[in-house]
Amino acid sequence: MLSDINISRKHVCKPIAEIATNLGIVESELSVHGANKAKISLSVTNRLASKPDAKLVIVTAVTPTPYGEGKTVTTVGLTQAMNAIGVKTCACIRQPSMGPVFGIKGGAAGGGYAQVVPMEELNLHLTGDIHAVSSAHNLAAAAIDARLFHETRLGAIAFTKESGLNAVNIDPENILWRRVVDHNERSLRQIEVGFGAVNGPVHSSGFDITKASELMAILALSRDVKDLRQRVGRLVLALDLVGKPITAEDIGVAGAMTVIMRDAIEPTLMQTLSGDPCFIHAGPFANIAHGNSSIIADSIASKLADVVVTEAGFGSDMGFEKFSNIKVRESGYKPSAAVVVVTLRALKANSGIESEVAIDQPDMARLEAGFANLQWHINNVHQYGAPVVVAINRFPTDTSAELDWLQAKVATTNAFGCAISDAFANGAQGAAELAKVVHAATMVESEFNCLYETTDTLESKLMTLAEVGYGAASVSLSDKAKLQLAWLHKQGYSELPVCIAKTPMSISHDPNVKGVPRNFELPINELRLNAGAGFITALVGKVMTMPGLGIKPGYLNIDIDADDEIIGLA
């Protein structure tokens, strides 16, 4: 079988204007960027405001493993197959970060014959949204440091007299806004800035990867430009000398930041190998942010299609939980069905059993032990109220006996249905059975619900997520987190939803604990306010907001060949 990039390159894409027209987008709503992608105006939703919303399908997965579960493959393959059986369907996915592309994970266009094309355009730059987020974010960092410099240099009274602005009295020990770059760069995690006689004061800072920026979460959760502008204005950049928040509005940078992001608020339209529409927009990580594509992309797609298929990052304890308790709460757009992706390899890897048998070889002992992880994720998704469909993403080495066993086991759970998907190898045809089961699930009456009310106390929300969301026995707060909790209450932020930042490699906070962890204590190390995005992030265990490159990063394989073609992109 050809590599993903060769499959993409051999494919002849339809003109993107044709994809848009077939979807129902008119010419005035289309801004073409080259031959294969286009920005779509938010005016679509106004034109089609009276049209009922499409059914929404959310794709999640079991606890992730190094082998890959194929969530994007399933999202794209399901979209292809739904259209093939006559159900007008559009996909909505996140924009990939170049950090993982050049690191270890690779791109995020799907794979095989279930991918968004051209994959190299999707994985590298796209229409520049991530760069816009980086620029807007770093403008705020420059603005807060410049304000600190001038207020310190002149003093509050002279500063106000010379500038006409009120002094905000920034505490240099409490500058919360770091910088961002869209690469994995561990050496920038902790830095000191302001050295030199005319560059200070010196203070601690650091870099996060752009997808960890609160601006990325804001982009994903905003409804329109007005909402974006208001959210940017609420960003807390620092604290003043008496511990009160200083916002982007306070230092006058919110308007300029919004201007930089004005075009980024429009989703980008591309196509699958079958010529099906796919919106790509925003890209917050699911382990450190809320891990879902934008509300705007969903809302536009919901007026143009009959079914919208989107995905949430990592396992159901991560992106799906945040989809349910943060994104749905903001958008009001509830799913009609949820798909849990699983592979035989994932069950074996999540079994917690060490074995000399290769992961792609039959091993019933590990399969049986690992099934508990799938059972947990089915139950986890089911408690939110949407019908659950299990998609078994098939690999070439999977045996019929193993697949039959797994289907029989799923039949004993409270899943609505189960189907094997071979979309990677066979595109729409490979996901035909899955499409039928998912379509049937969307026809079932269901009542979707969140796990908690925002009016619950912060302590109660943390406890609910720990116990009901992860199966923890208790929660512990560090001394730092306790002080932050009291501050959040005092400043009036206690009614915001909670976003747990933790490892995706286990349901618990410990990546080494596989299967279904039980009776553990969830350690909350830090609470971070995201006033613009509208949630409080609780850092659990060891969480990095800036990845590092491994010993053999992906960029070693990437180059330009003699024909000026990109090679080695995965």
From Swiss-Prot:
It catalyses: (6S)-5,6,7,8-tetrahydrofolate + formate + ATP = (6R)-10-formyltetrahydrofolate + ADP + phosphate. PROSITE patterns: FTHFS_1, FTHFS_2. Its EC number is 6.3.4.3. Pathway: One-carbon metabolism; tetrahydrofolate interconversion. One of its GO terms (molecular function) is formate-tetrahydrofolate ligase activity. GO terms for biological process: tetrahydrofolate interconversion. ATP binds at residues 65-72. It is an enzyme of class 6 (ligase). InterPro entries: Formate_THF_ligase, Formate_THF_ligase_CS, P-loop_NTPase. It holds the Pfam family FTHFS. Keywords: ATP-binding, Ligase, Nucleotide-binding, One-carbon metabolism. HAMAP family: FTHFS. NCBIfam families: PRK13505.1, PRK13506.1. Belongs to the formate--tetrahydrofolate ligase family. This is Formate--tetrahydrofolate ligase. The lineage of its organism: Bacteria, Pseudomonadati, Pseudomonadota, Gammaproteobacteria, Alteromonadales.
